[in-house]
Structures are given as structure tokens and as C-alpha cells.
């Protein structure tokens, strides 16, 4: 039986992180950006005090962009114990547990569950809601659930975690709800992945005159400008979705606006990706959103069972779905479940932003055999001209 070398795995992960952070430091130096490391807080609207390893330093500024991010939400009844971790702690890979509990059936929880189950851990998942990966259309999640039906142990939906106790042999967790076991369950490791809270109340924003909501978010306009005109904010601290690529885009907008350019955040879509196995990705309007907003829509679903590349990969469980405006046939959203779905969703993102219709996508020549051509085939399917499936009625 293959053995997992955690030391080598940690070293590889550390090497990747070091390479990326070193690259950022190099780019900052090339642009003559001074990096001050430490914990910072505003002193007034034009000064920030930073407490670093070598003492305090006051930074004076004419304009500022707040990118203070968020932190993992903690459950008050969870014991302070190294066997209870958040996603950051889980990525440190201190140990390979025999039995692990993931609290939270969202993207982060399921990604970590995928990692640890791949390494050999027995995984239980508990989720308060009636489904996993909420936010994604249920047909996408259903494929993931079927593929992982035997991968995890007990998946407890509509169930709360109500108590926990640290003992020498593990963390004992008590549940309440529809799928809750009667007795407390013992785990070697517990991951708490129940969301993140913004750091708006930790930076002395009030001293700069920046308004912060009760929950710690900072409200901004379309230029990412706060109520103080020369101070901007981006990322998790300005609201959902808390995604790195959204934050980067907001950063571009804020920097350009601070430079005096007419830059605005007006994205028509923000893609979401669950880096699970299989991956689940979606962008633009979901079917659930269309129904809730009363949007008349049509859809086309191309099954990967008809994809030569998916069949050759031995991974044809997925599908590619495009969602169209019923009247104009423009692409307004889409979802993909399957191998490398996160890489494939980019074409859907561009289609939504550019106002492409089914004919635009369907008549774009895609390389064969690839998973990417499933996007083109879904568009052809909607137009009734796909030759890789039985005849369809032309729209």
C-alpha cells in the first residue's frame, strides 16, 4: 500500500508558497514599492501606525486602499486545541488523521475534505443547510455527490454541531438535527469551515473616518471608494463573494480610480470554482437565480459521456451547461462539473461579459479532442445543430 510522506508534501507546498511570495516581493521592488511588514491601524485620515518586529513605524499617505481581508469564523463552544483547525491550519498538514470531521459543507470545507480523504483519512461532513455547496445549481452538485458517494463516511445535512470536548484520545463532538448520531462522535481532527468574517473592525478605520458596518464590512461605491474620498477598500472586507479573483479585479479598479482614471467595478459575472474532485465551476446567472429573478431563460447541457477527451481520460461523469436569455439567445451564465472545470469556465465568463450568443460560441472553432469543445457543443445543442448527439429541434 502506498505511503504518504507528509514531510515531503509539506516541503513541496512550502516551496510553491515561497516561489509565489518571492515573485510578489520582486515585482514590488521592480515597481519601487516599499513594503512595511507588521500589524497596521489608522491614526487619522492620512496616517497609519504599523507595529513590526523592529518597533513602530508611522506611514503617511495621500491615498489608501484597504485590503485587510477576513478571518475564519470560530465556533464559541469549540475547545482551544491543536486538533481543531480552520482552513489555514488544515493546510499546514501537521498530521494525517485517521478520522476527521469537516464542519461546513461549502466550497472550502469540501475542498479540504477532498484533500484529506485523498491522503487516506475517513471523513464525516456536517452541514446545517439541506444541501452541499449552496450557491451552485443542484444538477452540478448532484454529479459531485454521485461521484463521491463512497468517498466520505457520514454526510449529515440539516444538522448542527452543538458541542465539543477535547480528550486525550480525540475531540468528541455532539450533534443535533435530522442526521445527527445520538452519541458524541470521536475525531482525530476537526476542521471548522463555516465561513469568514471581515477584518473591518481591526484596523482603526473609525480614526480615519471610514464607516464600518456592524458585521465589519466597509461599504464602497463603483470605484471602490469609501465614504472618505481618498480611501478605497477592496476584497473580502467589502462583501461577498469572498474570492481572490474578485479582489484582484477590485484592486485594479481602485488603483486606476486613485490615479484619476474613470474605472468602475461593473462585472457582469464573478466565477466560482470548487477545487474538489470532480471540480465544480459556475459563472453568471445560475438557474436558481433566473427562477428567483423571473428571468426567462433556456439552457443546453452537453454530457461528457459524448466527449471523446473525457472518455479517453476515463472521467466522463461531468457535463457542460450554458444558460441563455430566451429571447436573444445571449449567454447569461453557465456551469461545468468535471475534470478541470475551473479552467474551462473562463470561456463562459468571456461569453457573458462580451454579450456572445449561442451562434457566436457554436461557430467558434474549438480544438478537438478537448474538454473545452464541450462549451461549443453546448451552444450548438441550444441552436439545434450539434452533430455529436441525437437530432434536436432547431431553436
Residue ranges and their predicted role:
Residues 1, 71-73, 211-214, 261-271, ...:
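A short alpha-helix-loop-beta-strand transition element characteristic
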Residues 11, 15-21, 25, 91-92, ...:
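Rossmann-like dinucleotide-binding cores of NAD(P)H-dependent redox enzymes
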Residues 81-97, 185-258:
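FAD-site-proximal beta/loop scaffold in flavoenzymes
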Residues 259, 275-286, 291-395:
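Flexible, glycine-rich terminal cap/loop adjacent to redox cofactors
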Residues 1-14, 361:
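Short glycine/proline- and acidic residue-enriched helix-loop micro-motifs
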Residues 34-37, 41-52, 59, 120-222, ...:
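A Rossmann-like FAD-binding core segment of flavoenzymes
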Residues 66-122, 126, 151, 155, ...:
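Glycine-rich dinucleotide-binding loop and its adjacent helix/turn
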Amino acid at each position: 500500500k502506498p505511503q504518504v510522506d507528509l514531510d515531503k508534501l509539506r516541503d513541496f507546498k512550502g516551496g510553491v508558497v515561497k516561489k509565489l511570495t518571492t515573485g510578489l516581493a520582486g515585482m514590488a521592488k521592480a515597481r519601487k514599492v516599499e513594503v512595511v511588514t507588521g500589524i497596521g491601524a489608522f491614526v487619522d485620515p492620512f496616517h497609519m501606525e504599523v507595529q513590526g518586529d523592529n518597533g513602530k513605524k508611522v506611514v503617511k499617505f495621500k491615498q489608501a486602499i484597504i485590503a485587510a481581508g477576513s478571518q475564519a469564523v470560530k465556533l464559541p463552544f469549540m475547545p482551544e486545541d491543536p486538533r481543531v483547525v480552520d482552513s489555514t491550519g488544515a493546510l499546514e498538514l501537521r498530521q494525517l488523521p485517521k478520522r476527521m470531521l469537516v464542519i461546513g459543507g461549502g466550497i472550502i470545507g469540501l475542498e479540504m475534505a477532498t484533500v484529506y480523504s485523498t491522503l487516506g483519512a475517513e471523513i464525516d461532513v456536517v452541514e446545517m443547510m439541506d444541501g452541499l455547496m449552496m450557491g451552485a445549481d443542484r444538477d452540478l452538485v448532484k454529479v459531485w455527490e454521485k461521484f463521491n458517494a463512497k468517498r466520505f463516511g457520514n454526510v449529515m445535512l440539516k444538522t448542527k454541531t452543538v458541542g465539543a470536548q477535547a480528550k486525550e484520545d480525540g475531540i468528541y463532538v455532539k450533534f443535533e438535527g435530522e442526521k445527527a448520531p445520538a452519541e458524541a462522535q470521536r475525531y482525530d481532527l476537526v476542521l471548522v469551515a463555516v465561513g469568514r468574517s471581515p477584518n473591518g473592525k481591526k484596523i482603526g478605520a473609525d480614526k480615519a473616518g471610514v464607516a464600518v458596518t456592524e458585521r465589519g464590512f466597509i461599504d464602497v461605491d463603483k470605484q471602490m471608494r469609501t465614504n472618505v474620498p481618498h480611501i478605497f477598500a477592496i476584497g473580502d472586507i467589502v462583501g461577498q463573494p469572498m474570492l481572490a479573483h474578485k479582489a484582484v479585479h477590485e484592486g485594479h479598479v481602485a488603483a486606476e480610480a486613485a490615479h484619476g482614471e474613470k474605472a468602475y467595478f461593473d462585472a457582469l459575472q464573478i466565477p466560482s470554482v470548487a477545487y474538489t474532485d470532480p471540480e465544480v465551476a459556475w459563472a453568471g446567472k445560475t438557474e436558481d437565480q433566473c427562477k428567483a429573478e423571473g428571468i426567462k431563460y433556456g439552457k443546453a447541457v452537453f454530457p461528457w459521456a459524448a466527449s471523446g477527451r473525457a472518455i479517453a481520460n476515463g472521467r466522463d461523469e461531468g457535463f457542460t451547461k450554458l444558460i441563455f436569455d430566451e429571447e436573444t439567445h445571449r449567454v447569461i451564465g453557465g456551469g461545468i462539473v468535471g475534470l478541470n472545470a475551473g479552467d474551462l469556465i473562463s470561456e463562459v465568463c468571456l461569453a457573458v461579459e462580451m454579450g456572445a450568443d449561442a451562434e457566436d460560441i457554436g461557430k467558434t472553432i474549438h480544438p478537438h479532442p478537448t474538454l473545452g469543445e464541450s462549451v461549443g457543443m453546448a451552444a450548438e445543442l441550444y441552436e439545434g445543430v450539434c452533430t455529436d448527439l441525437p437530432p434536436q429541434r432547431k431553436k
